[in-house]
Design a protein with these regions (language model features):
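Acidic-glycine-rich active-site phosphate/pyrophosphate-binding loop
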Residues: 1-6, 53
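Nucleotide phosphate-binding/pyrophosphate-handling subdomain across enzymes
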Residues: 9-107
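A structural signal for short, well-ordered beta-strand elements
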Residues: 30, 132-133, 168
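Alpha-helix N-cap recognition
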Residues: 70, 135-139, 171
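Phosphate- and divalent-cation-binding pockets in alpha/beta enzyme and binding domains
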Residues: 73, 119-120, 168
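C-terminal helical cap/extension that packs against the catalytic core
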Residues: 97-155
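Short beta-strands and strand-loop turn motifs
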Residues: 157-162
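Glycine/threonine-rich flexible loop motifs
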Residues: 166-173
């Protein structure tokens, strides 16, 4: 199976596998050799700050999804990862509602940052565990404290703010 030959972490999440299946079918139509297709896929780099896996170590995956500035854009990452420690917060989009149905079981705990912590707390408080961390530095420290309690359990550290972060950062790169 071609799936076993794909080693690119970015592309092996469920939605990307679907896209990959389409790309593979198109490559067959255009008679691209499988070896060339596999090489291209395994060297493909996704867009920075879009579900960017920037570190995998000791069963812990670190994902920067800082371009996710609404709940809908964050939901992709919540749906396709497990054992999530979710860092979120900032300036929410007007009318954005957090429907955690189908994703809450993937989240171990969330860490809320930014100036609008009450907004986020009210969106998630009866659905998932949370802690108000106020800023990214505190959130990272809080996540690592939780990881120490989990001792070698697989985990995903997800920075996917579900909002704009102009209250804390110059831009999504900062």
């Amino acid at each position: 199976s071609i799936k076993k030959k794909i080693t690119n972490d970015y592309l092996i999440s469920q939605p990307n596998l679907e896209n990959l299946a389409y790309a593979y079918q198109i490559s067959k139509i255009y008679k691209v050799k499988e070896k060339i297709f596999i090489k291209a896929i395994n060297t493909f780099k996704g867009l920075p700050h879009r579900h960017e896996i920037f570190l995998k170590k000791n069963k812990i995956t670190f994902i920067n999804d800082s371009k996710a500035t609404s709940f809908e854009s964050t939901k992709y990452a919540l749906k396709n990862n497990k054992n999530i420690f979710w860092i979120l917060g900032g300036l929410p989009k007007i009318g954005d509602k957090f429907n955690l149905k189908g994703v809450s079981s993937n989240i171990i705990k969330s860490f809320v940052i930014g100036k609008k912590t009450n907004y986020f707390k009210n969106q998630i408080k009866e659905k998932i565990k949370y802690k108000i961390s106020f800023n990214l530095k505190n959130a990272i420290n809080d996540v690592f404290k939780e990881l120490l309690l989990k001792k070698n359990s697989p985990a995903t550290i997800l920075f996917s703010p579900a909002s704009a972060s102009y209250d804390q950062f110059i831009d999504f790169v900062d």
